[in-house]
Amino acid sequence: MAKKVQAYVKLQVAAGMANPSPPVGPALGQQGVNIMEFCKAFNAKTDSMEKGLPIPVVITVYADRSFTFVTKTPPAAVLLKKAAGIKSGSGKPNKDKVGTITRAQLQEIAQTKAADMTGADIEAMTRSIEGTARSMGLVVED
């Protein structure tokens, strides 16, 4: 018989930099999970990724206080900021443009995100990422 699920905990943790301080410690401590065990496992799984990149993670906590976790791809906004070389998006995206990004870069980001996105094809995913870019104040060039 399968283990009984106690809770699902969704967090964004920097790749390779999980530690017991907030947000990890309080979220997992509440559920009675061994925090250091999670930190070691997460850091081992994300050591091949760029350090400091925020990685969404879904932690499944079981009734016996054991856990499993699934890492997702970084948020599209983070990948767009990195590709455009900007620190943050525009406060007024329709008026103030903060940078430019090419369609090739958008397709590259869409392929990175393909595992997590439910789009029908790569073109649909690219258009979705393009919408995110525009809402951040980025100009899309062909």
From Swiss-Prot:
Residue runs in coiled coils: none
Q: Does the keyword Isomerase apply?
A: no
Checking Pfam families in the record gives:
Ribosomal_L11, Ribosomal_L11_N
Q: Which residues form the signal peptide?
A: none
Instruction: Supply one GO CC term from the record.
Output: cytosolic large ribosomal subunit
Segments crossing the lipid bilayer? none
One annotated GO molecular function: large ribosomal subunit rRNA binding
Task: Describe how it is modified after translation.
Answer: One or more lysine residues are methylated.
In terms of PROSITE patterns, this protein maps to: RIBOSOMAL_L11
Q: Which UniProt keywords apply?
A: Methylation, Ribonucleoprotein, Ribosomal protein, RNA-binding, rRNA-binding
Please give the biological process terms from Gene Ontology that the record holds.
translation
PANTHER family for this protein: 60S RIBOSOMAL PROTEIN L12, LARGE RIBOSOMAL SUBUNIT PROTEIN UL11M
Family as reported in the entry's similarity comment: Belongs to the universal ribosomal protein uL11 family.
**Protein role:** Forms part of the ribosomal stalk which helps the ribosome interact with GTP-bound translation factors.
**Subunit field text:** Part of the ribosomal stalk of the 50S ribosomal subunit. Interacts with L10 and the large rRNA to form the base of the stalk. L10 forms an elongated spine to which L12 dimers bind in a sequential fashion forming a multimeric L10(L12)X complex.
Protein name stated in the entry: Large ribosomal subunit protein uL11
> What is the organism of origin for this protein?
Cronobacter sakazakii (strain ATCC BAA-894)
